[in-house]
């Protein structure tokens, strides 16, 4: 899936079934369903999922937990990046 296709999918009421888990997590996060996004990334054990896990905790305001997950992903806490910028960056890393 390409970037614009993903963005267009956000106009739909349900998540496209073909999305892999990390993209599904970003989709649900964009739709305001933080808990669902969090549940999805908890089930995946890779660097991308850890980055998204960090992002959702940062969005929640749980910086301590977010820093833990950034560390697991080999990343640093993005002090100067907005949540919107980080979400977009994560998406671009996955779909180009």
Report residues per predicted region.
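Residue-level signature for tetratricopeptide repeat
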Residues: 23-27, 56-57
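TPR/TPR-like alpha-solenoid helical repeat scaffolds
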Residues: 11-12, 18, 54-63, 80-96
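TPR repeat positional signature
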Residues: 21, 50-53
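Repeat-mediated protein-protein interaction surfaces in helical alpha-solenoids
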Residues: 1-13, 26-39, 88-90
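TPR/TPR-like (Sel1-like) alpha-helical repeat modules
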Residues: 45-47, 59-81
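Solenoid-like repeat scaffolds
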Residues: 8-15, 38-47, 74-78
């Amino acid at each position: 899936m390409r970037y614009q296709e993903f963005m267009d999918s956000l106009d739909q009421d349900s998540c496209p079934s073909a999305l892999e888990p990390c993209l599904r997590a970003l989709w649900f996060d964009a739709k305001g369903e933080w808990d669902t996004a969090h549940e999805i990334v908890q089930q995946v054990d890779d660097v991308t999922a850890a980055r998204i896990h960090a992002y959702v905790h940062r969005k929640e305001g749980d910086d301590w937990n977010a820093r833990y997950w950034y560390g697991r992903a080999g990343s640093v806490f993005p002090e100067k990046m907005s949540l919107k910028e980080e979400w977009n960056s994560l998406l671009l890393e996955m779909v180009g």
